[in-house]
Amino acid sequence: MKTSKWIDISQPLNNDIATWPGDTPFSYEVLWSKEESGSVNVGKLTMSIHTGTHIDAPFHFDNDGKKVLDLDIQVYVGPTRIIDVSNLESIGKKELEKFHLEGVERLLLRTSSHGKANEFPDIIPHLRADIAPFLSEKGIRLIGVDVPSVDPLDDKELAAHHQLFKHSIHILENVVLDHVADGDYELIALPLALSDADGSPVRAVIRPI
């Protein structure tokens, strides 16, 4: 039986990648070269946790919330469904009711609203808070989006973040979905084992099932 190849749905991390305004710019540099050390190249990485494709832990928006190492890593591995919700200003229960989501535990939303990893968007389609109980009723445990946040970029209340985690739904942001079709896939998007962190970069990959 032929096994499908894994497809990368992560934003490549490089010195040109966009970051949240005012956040730490991404930087990779060779701190010691092989010539200097006599044996190896050693790199230095500086970045915000919320750069590129990443997950949010509840501690990101709740001082009493779980940190990355407290999260159930099983949620970030397993069957997922990709659906198209492009050309919408916001996404909630009403927009998702037309999709068959019974039995789905992980859901990735393609908005196709912003495909430039080196430019931070001015506006994005966001999730409305009423999406959380709807997804929970369906048994969905992880929601992924192809934009930097599930909430509006200038929003301070973060209603979608709070409601999603209130309903035990994990958040994956900045996935790249324009090169993959709608359908069912196997997903791996494991966070790093960061003890006290409010989120983590991930290498998100999928393959058809």
From Swiss-Prot:
EC number, UniProt record: 3.5.1.9
Annotated positions binding substrate: 20
Annotated binding of Zn(2+) 1, by residue: 50, 54, 56, 173
GO biological process: anthranilate metabolic process; L-tryptophan catabolic process to kynurenine
Protein name: Kynurenine formamidase
Lineage, broadest ranks: Bacteria, Bacillati, Bacillota, Bacilli, Bacillales
Cofactor(s) the record lists: Zn(2+)
Organism this protein belongs to: Bacillus anthracis
Purpose of the protein: Catalyzes the hydrolysis of N-formyl-L-kynurenine to L-kynurenine, the second step in the kynurenine pathway of tryptophan degradation.
Catalytic activity: N-formyl-L-kynurenine + H2O = L-kynurenine + formate + H(+)
Gene name as annotated: kynB
Family: Belongs to the Cyclase 1 superfamily. KynB family.
SUBUNIT field: Homodimer.
